[in-house]
Structures are given as C-alpha cells and as structure tokens.
Amino acid sequence: MKMTLIAILTCAAVLVLHTTAAEELEAESQLMEIGMPDTELEAVDEERLFECSVSCEIEKEGNKDCKKKKCKGGWKCKFNMCVKV
C-alpha cells in the first residue's frame, strides 16, 4: 500500500514538473516567432520604466541625491527612465 502511494505521488510530481517545463518552452517559442507583435516585451519595457521612475522619486524625498535603480538585462537608468544600452 505504501509503495503504491509513493509511486502515485512520484508520478504526480513528475507530471507537474513536465507540464511546467512544457509551458515555459511554449511561451519561449511564441516569443521567438518572427512577425509576432512584441506586446509582451512592450509590457516588460513599461514595467521597467515605472520601477525606475518610482525608485528614483522615493529616494528624492529624503533630500538626498537620487541614486537611480540599476536596470538589468542591457538597460540602464537615465533621466528617471530605464533605457536600452
């Protein structure tokens, strides 16, 4: 009985991991398709812009020099915005 339960739980865990990996691969392949609108990437860009601006504004309130948030992945913070390097 214990072995059956362990086997069922193991299979369920493998199925969940496999499904998650398959979903990630599908999402990646959709982003890599040529001719697909970059709406997903535009949303990421807008999010970076917002995060950078908000971070800088919060630091200005303390009467200190604004230390801009470090933007990652080929981006840098300039004039309160994340810009592509």
From Swiss-Prot:
Asked if the keyword NAD belongs to this entry, the reply reads no
GO cellular component, as recorded:
extracellular region; host cell postsynaptic membrane
Compartments annotated for it: namely: Secreted
Q: Which UniProt keywords apply?
A: Disulfide bond, Neurotoxin, Postsynaptic neurotoxin, Secreted, Signal, Toxin
Question: Per its record, what are the GO molecular function terms?
Answer: toxin activity
Q: Which PROSITE patterns match?
A: HWTX_2
- Would the keyword Transferase turn up in this protein's UniProt record? no
Q: Which organism is it from?
A: Cyriopagopus hainanus (Chinese bird spider)
What is the name of the protein in this document?
U4-theraphotoxin-Hhn1a
Top-level taxonomic group:
Eukaryota
Q: Which family does it belong to?
A: Belongs to the neurotoxin 12 (Hwtx-2) family. 02 (Hwtx-2) subfamily.
Fill in the subunit field for this protein. Answer: Monomer.
Phylogenetic classification of the source organism: Eukaryota, Metazoa, Ecdysozoa, Arthropoda, Chelicerata
Q: What Pfam family is a match for this entry?
A: Toxin_20
Which parts of this protein are propeptide? 23-48
SUPFAM superfamilies referenced in this protein's UniProt entry, alphabetically: omega toxin-like
